[in-house]
A protein has these predicted regions:
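Non-catalytic substrate-recognition and accessory regions of acyl/acetyltransferase enzymes
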Residues: 1-84, 90-164
Length: 164
């Protein structure tokens, strides 16, 4: 997994309510909608204007199968600036893992992505493991905002994080 740096400003366009699939659940007042290639989180507390509601975050996803297990790969996560720092991303990842099956990290992660997986490991509601060379290894959260594996360096190898 590689470390990457991303831009700091995100202004996501409002979501058109008719185009969204059925919600899989809520995180506070935010509804989570899962499609084949995207997870969209919409703020339900705001008044809809012209059939649109503010988008809190979007996660690009893809479905892969490894050793007979179907994973949803959580790729690029974009968060609207107005909702940053509220801890919504880790809660959305937990909800998606519980409702749709195991999730997996992408091949590269920004600082924010590493922080999300660290929060998942710290909360302990999901089992977070590192998949490296076909073997699952335990990981632990660190005070540096990223998870660490016991036997190898997680971010300098081709390892992927998995949660279920």
């Amino acid at each position: 997994m590689e470390r990457i740096d991303l831009g700091k400003v995100n202004r996501l366009p409002a979501a058109i309510l008719e185009n969204l699939p059925e919600s899989i659940g809520n995180v506070g007042c935010y509804s989570v909608h899962v499609e084949e290639d995207c997870v969209t989180v919409v703020d339900q507390s705001k008044v809809a204007r012209r059939g649109r509601k503010p988008t809190v975050m979007e996660i690009s996803t893809e479905i892969i199968r490894r050793r007979g297990v179907k994973y949803r790969v959580m790729g690029y996560t974009r968060m609207n600036d107005a909702y940053r720092g509220a801890g919504v991303a880790a809660l959305v990842y937990e909800l998606v893992a519980k409702q749709t099956g195991p999730i997996m990290s992408g091949s590269s992660q920004s600082g924010g992505g590493r922080s999300i997986w660290n929060t998942l490991a710290k909360r302990g509601l999901l089992t977070v493991l590192a998949n490296w060379k076909g073997v699952y290894h335990e990981v632990e959260s660190t005070e540096f905002g990223e998870v660490a594996a016991y036997n190898f360096s997680l971010y300098s190898t081709a390892a992927r994080l998995c949660a279920a």
